[in-house]
A protein has these predicted regions:
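Beta-propeller blade termini and top-face loops
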Residues: 1-374
């Protein structure tokens, strides 16, 4: 169960003793929560299956036999209190984390989806009828996050999933193999975020960066790795305990903390690499990882121990970067978007509550017009 992430209780409007416990399975209580029984559901890999994990629930106030549940794969509808289900497949509710493209013609779009793996599909097609579902290919399993083609040969590429899992895949055979960085020594336990930082080197197609509490680099497409940074997080032991106030442990890696969320190598200068963490640290190297500077105190208005969700190194100036931070996990839904033009010596907040409503997750600077930012 994941009370820190998702779990809801719903009450039947006709019967206050009937409660629904909404998390991975769905269970119901008929005695005000003293006991719960599972609601039968067909697994998602079978015809008309209902996809966990469940995040939303609605009971028809006029008919308690009719309810709708929402999860990582869409919605499920029942008219007979869960005895049978309808799973509508025409609602576009896929949740993408990261997107990339290759250089094929037509070029392909790649994306990692919440609890639905990593996929690729054509951006357009030469055939009549448009882009069909069957044109999309499943590449790497698990919770899909980063996925990026190998531009030397788009048959191959890289995909990430939960717990820091990193794979190199083969589109033709469907096979993929783990290339996750190993522990640097027997006494060092790596801390990978649920959505661990990944970046390709814009100067070398064989080089990749991956983040635990360290920045890891490979120069041979994942065959070997080396650590090029110290621990860039606060490394607070109190945030790394297996027990958090008595809450039921998820035991899936989603509770990992003090980890790197963002890595951004500069497309202008190969020695410049930015990194951001889930505990509010902003770090920079200007010598390819030999030395790192903590820039956190230079970012005025940065909430303490917030999530540095994304850093984008500018394609126009080596010292410029954009940074997205969010703090909604602490009830702060303000958008935090910062920009530096001097290697992090000073930062300007580019978006606030007067310009953008809701917290921010990502930023993109236009590749042609530097003043156009999304």
């Amino acid at each position: 169960n994941r009370p820190f992430y998702f779990q809801e209780l719903a009450v039947d409007t006709k019967d206050p003793n009937r409660l629904y416990n909404i998390y991975q399975p769905l269970s119901v209580s008929y005695d005000g929560g003293k006991s719960f029984d599972p609601v039968p559901m067909i697994p998602a890999d079978e015809t008309k299956g209902i996809h966990a994990d469940f995040h939303a629930f609605w009971v028809n106030p006029a008919d308690p036999q009719h309810f709708i549940i929402g999860g990582d794969g869409g919605i499920g509808i029942t008219q007979d209190h869960g005895k049978s289900w309808y799973f509508p497949e025409t609602i576009p509710v896929a949740q993408f984390y990261h997107i990339s493209v290759d250089n094929d013609r037509p070029y392909n779009v790649y994306g990692g989806m919440q609890d639905n793996g990593n996929w690729s599909g054509p951006a357009y097609t030469w055939k009549r009828g448009g882009i069909r579902t069957l044109y999309w290919q499943y590449l790497v399993g698990g919770d899909g996050f980063y996925i990026a083609p190998d531009l030397d040969n788009s048959r191959y590429g890289y995909g990430t999933s939960q717990n820091g899992s990193l794979y190199r895949y083969d589109k033709l055979t469907g096979y993929y193999v783990s290339i996750k960085p190993p522990q640097p020594d027997l006494n060092t336990r790596l801390r990978f975020n649920w959505n661990a930082a990944f970046a390709k080197d814009p100067h070398d197609e064989s080089s990749l960066y991956y983040g635990s509490q360290f920045v890891h680099v490979t120069h041979d497409k994942g065959a070997t790795w080396e650590v090029i940074s110290p621990d860039l997080t606060t490394n607070n032991p109190a945030h790394q305990k297996p027990d958090y106030g008595g809450l039921t442990l998820d035991v899936s890696g989603a509770e990992m903390y003090n980890s790197i969320l963002a890595i951004a190598p500069s497309p202008i200068n190969e020695n410049v690499i930015w990194a951001g963490t889930d505990d509010g640290q902003v770090q920079l190297t200007r010598d390819g990882g030999k030395t790192w500077k903590n820039l956190t105190k230079q970012v005025k208005g940065l909430p303490n121990e917030s999530w540095v969700a994304q850093i984008k190194a500018s394609p126009y100036t080596a010292g410029a970067a954009w940074m997205v931070v969010n703090n909604y996990r602490k009830g702060d839904y303000s958008p935090y978007l910062f920009k530096t033009e001097n290697f992090g010596k000073s930062w300007t907040r580019m978006a606030d509550d007067t310009k953008v409503k809701g917290y921010a997750l990502s930023v993109v600077q236009d590749p042609v017009e530097p003043n156009l930012v999304f």
